[in-house]
Amino acid sequence: MFVKGLEKVMDIVRSVTVDQPVERVFTYLSDFTTTTEWDPGTVRTTREVGDGGVGTRYRNVSRFLGRETELVYVVEDLSPNERLRLRGENQTVVAHDTLSFMPNADGSTTVTYRAQFELKGLARLAAPLLAPAFRRLGNEAEQGLRGALERL
């Protein structure tokens, strides 16, 4: 966790390397509805508008600390086989999710997943107490991501 201005930001970064070509990994993860298959907190993700490219809007419902929360995500950047960046928001948080893809010489792919959560309003005050839960969320997402990508 770090402080950005007056806002508390939770920053989770995880990398996984899987024995899959970058094209297959990117195609799978650039469809954000697949979060239901690899993000243990996701209850459902639906695409509302768009074809998956920049400007596409997704509605994500997740369970965090026993409560369901809904964020609307928009694809801000999509560079095939290199990067996918989305921004999600609701009344208490702004989320920035970035997935970076690196093809390796042996044909495997390394995916780096960075999730930044900027808490808003009174939720900022709880940031120090939420840090362990966000770390756990990152660990669970890493395991889910690795498992889903290995099954491709």
Name what the model sees in each region.
Residues 87-140:
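Beta-strand/loop substructures that line and gate deep hydrophobic ligand-binding cavities in soluble
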Residues 14-16, 62, 71-77, 88, ...:
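Hydrophobic/aromatic beta-strand elements that line small-molecule binding cavities or substrate pockets
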Residues 27-34, 40, 135, 139, ...:
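Short, intrinsically disordered, mixed-charge
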